[in-house]
Amino acid sequence: TFRMGSIPFLSKAAIGAQMDVDADFKTNKFILKENALSLNAIRATIDGWVAMTEKGMDMDIKLNSNEISFKEILSLIPAIYAKDFDGLKTSGEATLAAYAKGSMIGDSIMPAFDVNLNVKNAMFRYPSLPAGVDNINIAASVKNPGGSLDATTVSVNPFNLTLAGNPFSMTADVKT
């Protein structure tokens, strides 16, 4: 379970890992090779390295999900995952890719990072409901060039869907 304040972002999520790590304890550098992470039904590879320094951590880490089904993305939503998830009809594909590169020192200096989610031609429908959600297309990214978290930007363009025949479209750019 992950909460930010009083908002639950993940509830009773299943997390797994298969890790192959080369550890150099003299330099405090850990190299990640052929690793896999899972969060509910989503599987991703992770590779790169992390090094502990006197001030914090240096890193160059990449995460990639390749193509995953839209149903796997929906598995992250607690209400959907817990209730009638097996009967949920879905189609569409998604990709999730991320990286973090640079130094992390305390809470004030962060590495550069980029997280990208793309959903194409997706839909979902519960058999017991008269209509579903169709034509789901999302391109979302969270980016930071490194340094302060205040430099983080969030972009969503597009976020499109059709609910019971009614189209909905949104774009968002959030900067501090």
PLM regions: where:
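Extracellular loop and loop/strand-boundary signature of outer-membrane beta-barrel proteins
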Residues: 6-7, 82-86
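Hydrophobic lipid-interacting interfaces of membrane-associated proteins
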Residues: 1-55, 62-75, 90-105, 115-175
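Short, flexible segments with low predicted structural confidence
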Residues: 111-112
